[in-house]
């Protein structure tokens, strides 16, 4: 096909996909009866066609893009100016849609209002709102009776799975993207006019290449495993807690010794959960900070409004120095902090132990504050030997007499994530960067700044979830996805299929 030009609608030439006739009728899903369009607005595309958009990753960020695109196409379906729909595809490494499956702890709740779902802030009338999900599943009144804005985490993941199921025809699951490379230079313009996305089917190893004018990289963060921790099956990142620990420690009544490293929400949740999951186990929470610190979630502008979509504009327009100062000042809203009610529960548990055993060394559950794990070894019994180093701060240690040794059957690292996975996937794109000394710099609309002398204006790459330094603390959070998804749709496809506002 001819992939060198675009239609007036911003879609590639070639086989046209007419806007489907809208027709609603009942459809049964794996969870419960629902209503869905019998003819998707976004039909499947064969691998050998030039795509208008390929999204690398199909987590919440890419799902929000799919929803925003669907909603806008629905609004323009009867417009005489829209005669074709974009050709898009999502490539996802996981076997199905999943959101933090390793941290779906029993009883855990969301930390943001359900109103900040994948659609409501952008369009409360969208069929993809959390409230519509509840209505479809006949739970709207039941949820209302809970009197809360914070759904159970397991329910919110089910909501997102329900949304994702509407786009199943567009997603290639169990597909790992290997790299994104520039196309051959167009002989007429002398510029790159599309990109090649190379991926591998995990089950068979089959490698497939697809071509796209626009590529969104939204692969989320990689577990951060500090260098001092060796590769060991008994050392688990918090992201795999629920999916890995039960098989590793399969006797819930055994007197295990389990350590957790970290001082944020995940560390506190796991420490608290272990005491119920393994009632006879000894648990230890090890952290560099001197205490668990409460998150600041006041509704006033200085705190919660930091995560409002419009704050992204304000943050982006600041100088680099101002941005860095802002991030450091407001770190307590998102990093190494714990919701106050969980801190209170943990403190109450510690206090009961103090009543029973004045000697803290006799406690079943302990918190080792102002400590770091300096070394990890394993013995013949396969237990981990942890060397703890007490410290005044993160970098200044006390004398050796304050060091301790600890044995553990498992160590869970709640050490956060690194968000640089895009760099390896886009390694071949680096020579095309507009300002190589600035690294992977993106514009306000998340478009990677590429050299206009080398890359056609109608081709581009967008980065998601790795732009905190330029777009603020909300960049990796759910709070702004509804609006951001529409911004990406607008940036790629233009005003004719914008956010509809």
From Swiss-Prot:
Any single biological process term in GO: biosynthetic process
InterPro entries the UniProt entry points to: FAD/NAD-bd_sf, Lys/Orn_oxygenase
Protein name, as recorded: L-ornithine N(5)-monooxygenase
Compositionally skewed regions (Low complexity) per UniProt: 1-16
Keyword ATP-binding included in the entry's annotation: no
Region named Disordered: 1-40
Residues at which NADP(+) binds: 263-266, 334-336
UniProt binding sites for FAD: 92-100, 111, 177, 476-478
Cofactor(s) named in the record: FAD
Disulphide-bonded residues: none
Species in which this protein is naturally found: Arthroderma benhamiae (strain ATCC MYA-4681 / CBS 112371) (Trichophyton mentagrophytes)
Key words of the record: FAD, Flavoprotein, Monooxygenase, NADP, Oxidoreductase
GO molecular function: ornithine N5-monooxygenase activity
Compositional bias annotation for Polar residues: 26-37
EC code: 1.14.13.196
Cofactor note text: Binds 1 FAD per subunit.
PANTHER family: L-ORNITHINE N(5)-MONOOXYGENASE, MONOOXYGENASE
Subunit structure: Homotetramer.
Induction behaviour: Expression is under the control of the iron acquisition regulator hapX.
Catalysed reactions listed for this entry: L-ornithine + NADPH + O2 = N(5)-hydroxy-L-ornithine + NADP(+) + H2O; L-ornithine + NADH + O2 = N(5)-hydroxy-L-ornithine + NAD(+) + H2O
Function: L-ornithine N(5)-monooxygenase; part of the siderophore biosynthetic pathway. Arthroderma benhamiae produces 2 types of extracellular siderophores, ferrichrome C and ferricrocin. The biosynthesis of these siderophores depends on the hydroxylation of ornithine to N(5)-hydroxyornithine, catalyzed by the monooxygenase sidA. The structure of ferricrocin differs from ferrichrome C only by a serine for alanine substitution and the assembly of both siderophores is suggested to be performed by the nonribosomal peptide synthase (NRPS) sidC.
Functional pathway: Siderophore biosynthesis
